[in-house]
Amino acid sequence: MICDDVAYREDYVDYLIEYNGETETVLDIYKDTGCVNFIDERFAVLYRPKPDDYMESFSRLEYTLFPKLYGLMDTSSVEAVGAVNVQQENILGLTGKNIIIGIIDTGIDIQNPLFQNAVGQTRILAAWDQSVPGGEQTGEFPGYGTVYTGDEINEAIRNGTSVLQDENGHGTFLAGIAAGGKTDDFTGVAPEADFVIVKLKQAKQNLRGLYGVPEDVDAYQENDIMAGVAYLTRLAERYRR
């Protein structure tokens, strides 16, 4: 079974499964009927050909098998919790230096100076764009998104090209609030922190139909978010921050 692009194919459906860490056992069980991506040592995503009774199966299979869908947070709530005032007051002198802030959202505007250092280089250490299908070596999982290094993002900045493109603007906004650099009239909460970015792909139409979510509404799958968290965790361990 070819599994390279099942994260995007509408003729395959996603199931979130819990296992006990024995990956070989899971692979053996589903080797002829589906494809498996392991999120961590507890959860995995099973991709199987969409059954004819997919909609009906929602009522007879365990609810937790079906990834939930999530939308975007209203950006007005950021000011409501006082996040903007934390850095403006600067009472504690905290700048975020030597820490990593992970953003799992709609992408980020890499050309924005708020996310660059004093010499115009990116503060993004690494990024995983789930919305751009990759090859065997370019995704966090085979065929599932494209991973960029900080050097590759710097090259894109120099060339004036865009990766991690944020069509919505939500991810760029939240990244700016969290750790945007200092300007004359704006400072993020942690202006000297580094970033690791995960750009989520939009939810599949087959799952939208299951939950009644319109095609034109931004919606993101639980398993994609969980995979993003696992990616951030691995990067934090790698950088020891």
What positions do the PLM features span?
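Autoinhibitory propeptides
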Residues: 2-11, 15-100, 107-123
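Subtilisin-like serine protease catalytic core
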Residues: 90-224, 240-241
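Charged/polar, solvent-exposed surface patches and flexible loops
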Residues: 25-29, 126, 227, 234
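Short acidic, glycine-rich surface-loop motifs adjacent to enzyme active sites
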Residues: 69, 229-241
